[in-house]
Curated annotation (Swiss-Prot):
A molecular function (GO) term: protein dimerization activity
Family the entry assigns: Belongs to the ClpX chaperone family.
Subunit text: Component of the ClpX-ClpP complex. Forms a hexameric ring that, in the presence of ATP, binds to fourteen ClpP subunits assembled into a disk-like structure with a central cavity, resembling the structure of eukaryotic proteasomes.
Lineage: Bacteria, Bacillati, Bacillota, Clostridia, Natranaerobiales
UniProt protein name: ATP-dependent Clp protease ATP-binding subunit ClpX
InterPro entries xref list: AAA+_ATPase (IPR003593), ATP-dep_Clp_protease_ClpX (IPR050052), ATPase_AAA_core (IPR003959), Clp_ATPase_C (IPR019489), Clp_protease_ATP-bd_su_ClpX (IPR004487), ClpX_bact (IPR046425), P-loop_NTPase (IPR027417), Znf_CppX_C4 (IPR010603)
UniProt keyword list: ATP-binding, Chaperone, Metal-binding, Nucleotide-binding, Zinc
List of residues binding ATP: 118-125
ClpX-type ZB domain segment(s): 1-54
Role description: ATP-dependent specificity component of the Clp protease. It directs the protease to specific substrates. Can perform chaperone functions in the absence of ClpP.
Record: residues binding Zn(2+): 13, 16, 35, 38
């Protein structure tokens, strides 16, 4: 058994054997002593192991095809956008690994991503799902709330605070996260002509975003809000943070059509009406010069080299979104009904009626939940108090004419139509 003191009665460290005179401090435990030097050594060993673990987080980056397949489980359609994002994200985290190893002098520059498409087509969901696949912190910001530093509104650094909070204030983890900035088209320059009035929510925000998009050591106020000289800041390096910007870019289709139209002049040119092409097909032809004409500044466009467009969702796509993904809306409501002991059946014509209503409202997939909730609210109010019902059938009439659903009762085993 290890002795706690030497022949002269002096206390000594149970690990390295140094006496109390040879070290600064001895910490006592039940039948054991440890010196400050051994504590420091233990801390270094633990820190090394933690660093190794954090490096291992990206040692097995999913390949583009694997990322694509996982995205397919959650997102219907948008094949080209999913492919482009899978490659871009794979290359980004390969670059992060390469930077960590620093085996050569070749510096791979970061490729941030721009997603174009109408509202409700899956831009936000794509970014969220990517962060989930890679198990990295994720933060979302709305570009419309941002203003240039010194003006009323949010500073761009507050975006980074959301990411740090998502990483439970682990800055090192946050530095490998993903940030999605929505409605980036709303910070386009209001006019091509310079004005006496400062554009603090347009070009000013683009200028403020440049630094964090490219990579900088940013000072973030830990409580958010505006900076002031006497507060402490969290320092975060944005070099390895992947920024995904999204926007509807209303009107850019006309800019693209004007550019393409000029090439269709002359004898023998193929004449094609702009009306023959859908919005998704037009957006797929976007070039950086179109973004410049729309109002993004050249430096900003240069920081987002990966540009991908998303298609508007038609009736068939919306029906698939209702039933096919792992967390599909219909599956969620079936689970809610199942908890009350009731089977929920949504007929095909009812699903198509929901999809048509979403198209009429111009809300895309984002509006599907509100429509379903609106039409199922009354029956979800009544069912918990109806002990004899085991099945609820939603028909087209329930959606289009606000009729009551068809209920199957335990004691009769046949369909009964409930009148209002």
């Amino acid at each position: 058994m290890f002795k706690l003191n030497d022949e002269k009665g002096r206390l000594k460290c149970s690990f390295c054997g140094k006496t109390q005179e040879q070290v600064k401090k001895l910490v006592a435990g039940p039948g054991v002593y440890i010196c400050d030097e051994c504590i420091e050594l233990c801390n270094e060993i633990i820190e090394e192991e933690l660093n190794d673990d954090s490096d291992m987080g990206f040692s097995e980056i999913p390949k583009p095809q694997e990322i694509y397949e996982i995205l397919n489980d959650y997102i219907i359609g948008q094949e080209e956008a999913k492919k482009a994002l899978s490659v871009a994200v794979y290359n980004h985290y390969k670059r992060v690994n390469n930077e960590a190893k620093k085996k050569d002098d070749v510096e791979i520059q970061k490729s941030n991503i721009l997603l174009l498409g109408p509202t409700g087509v899956g831009k936000t969901l794509l970014a969220q799902t990517l962060a989930k696949i890679l198990n990295v912190p994720f933060a979302m910001a709305d570009a419309t709330s941002l203003t240039e530093a010194g003006y009323v509104g949010e500073d761009v650094e507050n975006i980074l605070l959301k990411l740090i909070q998502s990483a439970d204030y682990d800055v090192e983890k946050a530095e490998k996260g993903i940030v999605y900035i929505d409605e980036i088209d709303k910070v386009a320059r209001k006019t091509d002509n310079p004005s006496i009035t400062r554009d603090v929510s347009g070009e000013g925000v683009q200028q403020a975003l440049l630094r964090i998009l490219e990579g900088t050591k940013a000072s973030v106020p830990p409580q958010g809000g505006r900076k002031h000289p006497h507060q402490e800041f969290i320092q975060i390096d944005t070099t390895n943070i992947l920024f995904i910007c999204g926007g509807a870019f209303d009107g850019i289709d006309k800019i693209i059509q004007n550019r393409i139209g000029k090439k269709g002049l002359g004898f023998g040119a193929e004449v094609q009406s702009a009306k023959d092409e859908g919005i998704g097909e037009i957006l797929s032809k976007v070039l950086p010069q179109d973004l410049l004409k729309f109002g993004l500044i050249p430096e900003f466009v240069g920081r987002i080299p990966v540009i991908s467009s998303l298609d508007a969702l038609d009736e068939d796509a919306l029906v698939r979104i209702l039933v096919e993904p792992k967390n599909a809306l219909v599956k969620q409501y079936q689970k809610l009904f199942e908890i009350d002991g009731v089977e929920l059946e949504m007929q095909e014509d009812a699903l198509r009626a929901i999809a048509r209503e979403a198209i009429e409202r111009n809300t895309g997939a984002r509006g599907l939940r509100a429509i379903v909730e609106e039409h199922l609210n009354d029956i979800m109010y009544d069912l918990p108090s109806m002990d004899d019902v085991n099945k609820c059938i939603i028909t087209e009439e329930v959606i289009e004419k606000d009729e009551r659903p068809m209920l199957v009762k335990d004691n009769q085993g046949e369909k009964k139509h409930e009148s209002a």
